[in-house]
């Protein structure tokens, strides 16, 4: 259930409006004036609340819905309780998310912690730094020599924007973030604790142990990227580390030097991408995926959670396992191993 103390609705929406905005069909047109100001899981609901149910797996819940309105598929709509305004959509969850973005626009991007506007008197703006009108720099933030922050961008408390870094417009850089040697596009969201542009892991064996291989590249983050809390992105050794437009990266992800990530990829938490890995466009990585250095993942490939990738993955394929292999092969091997173990147990009892 949405808590007004944290997320107050921009305004009330009528069910008829929601139908028009999402493309859903209101099953009973006489209910178009019912108002919505809250969102909740299907099991909760309540007055002025919209819920959704998506897929057969949750179909058993539909009879107990007590919300003002329900988004669901055509096949589930006939089982909805009387008195609930039913909005029929082929993609209920996507329609619900659209309503959430409209009802709670402040949730689309984190807001200033202190409520300040403009540049806080407790921020440090170095000589030659440029902060465009409309940017918000909160207390304790440091904007380095020659750095720039675009209009509408929020820089949170105790964040450091390194010398000559640039951040585009309408972005967000959360508290306790460190940016170095980085060029950031427009509408980029960087959550608290992320560390971007630090040294890549570059060392060479020498006569007295390992010697540092200087990392002299950059990090380039294109427009509309979102980076989760405590994620780390190393700068390139010679070439740049690049995060493509529209890519979404979860918390606690490690991206090594010279990695190139394509457009609109999704990378779940605890993934590790070694140096010089290349991901195509629309790649999806489940949680805890590890990719060895210099591996290439083709466009629209998908890697299951906890996969250990040691070979290139062709475009459009789905891989799983350690070492990762095509998903069907991985599942057949798991089934064969299970069968072998069962046979061995039977043999030992005989």
Curated annotation (Swiss-Prot):
**Gene3D superfamilies found in the cross-reference section:** Hexapeptide repeat proteins, MurE/MurF, N-terminal domain
Q: What is the enzyme's main class?
A: transferase
- What are this entry's molecular-function GO terms? N-acyltransferase activity
- Its EC number(s): 2.3.1.191
Keyword annotations from UniProtKB, A to Z: Acyltransferase, Lipid A biosynthesis, Lipid biosynthesis, Lipid metabolism, Repeat, Transferase
The domain of life is Bacteria
InterPro entries attached here?
A: Hexapep, Hexapep_transf_CS, LpxD, Trimer_LpxA-like_sf, UDP_GlcNAc_AcTrfase_non-rep
Tell me the active site.
257
Tell me which Pfam families the record gives.
Hexapep, LpxD
GO biological process terms held by the UniProt record? lipid A biosynthetic process
Q: Quote the pathway field.
A: Bacterial outer membrane biogenesis; LPS lipid A biosynthesis
Q: Which PROSITE patterns match?
A: HEXAPEP_TRANSFERASES
SUPFAM superfamilies recorded: Trimeric LpxA-like enzymes
Q: Which Gene Ontology terms of cellular component type are present? A: membrane
Q: What does this protein do?
A: Catalyzes the N-acylation of UDP-3-O-acylglucosamine using 3-hydroxyacyl-ACP as the acyl donor. Is involved in the biosynthesis of lipid A, a phosphorylated glycolipid that anchors the lipopolysaccharide to the outer membrane of the cell.
Q: How is the subunit organization of this protein annotated in UniProt?
A: Homotrimer.
What name has this protein been given in UniProt?
UDP-3-O-acylglucosamine N-acyltransferase
- Organism source for this protein? Chelativorans sp. (strain BNC1)
């Amino acid at each position: 259930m949405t808590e007004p103390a944290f997320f107050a609705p921009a305004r009330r929406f009528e069910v008829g409006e929601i139908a028009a905005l999402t493309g859903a069909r209101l099953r009973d047109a006489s209910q178009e004036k019912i108002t919505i100001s809250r969102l909740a899981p299907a099991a909760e609901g309540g007055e002025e609340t919209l819920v959704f149910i998506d897929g057969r797996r949750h179909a058993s819940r539909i009879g107990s819905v007590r919300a003002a309105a329900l988004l669901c598929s055509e096949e589930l709509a006939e089982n909805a309780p009387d008195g609930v305004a039913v909005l029929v959509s082929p993609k209920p969850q996507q329609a619900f998310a659209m309503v959430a973005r409209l009802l709670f626009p402040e949730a689309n991007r984190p807001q200033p912690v202190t409520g300040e506007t403009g540049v806080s008197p407790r921020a440090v703006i170095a000589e030659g730094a440029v902060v465009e009108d409309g940017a918000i720099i909160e207390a304790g933030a440091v904007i380095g020599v020659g750095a720039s922050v675009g209009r509408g961008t929020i820089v949170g408390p105790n964040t450091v924007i390194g010398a000559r870094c640039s951040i585009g417009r309408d972005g967000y850089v959360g508290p306790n973030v460190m940016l170095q040697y980085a060029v950031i596009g427009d509408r980029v969201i960087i959550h608290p604790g992320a560390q971007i542009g630090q040294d890549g892991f570059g060392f060479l064996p020498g006569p007295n142990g390992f010697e540092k291989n200087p990392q002299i590249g950059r990090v380039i983050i294109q427009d509309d990227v979102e980076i989760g809390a405590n994620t780390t992105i190393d700068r390139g050794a010679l070439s740049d580390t690049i995060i493509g437009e529209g890519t979404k990266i979860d918390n606690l992800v490690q991206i090594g030097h010279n990695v190139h990530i394509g457009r609109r990829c999704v990378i779940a938490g605890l993934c590790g991408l070694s140096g010089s890995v290349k991901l195509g466009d629309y790649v999806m990585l489940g949680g805890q995926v590890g990719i060895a250095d210099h591996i290439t993942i083709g466009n629209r490939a998908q890697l299951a959670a906890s996969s250990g990738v040691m070979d290139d993955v062709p475009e459009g394929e789905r891989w799983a396992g350690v070492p990762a292999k095509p998903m069907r092969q991985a599942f057949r091997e798991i089934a064969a191993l299970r069968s072998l173990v069962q046979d061995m147990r039977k043999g030992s009892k005989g």
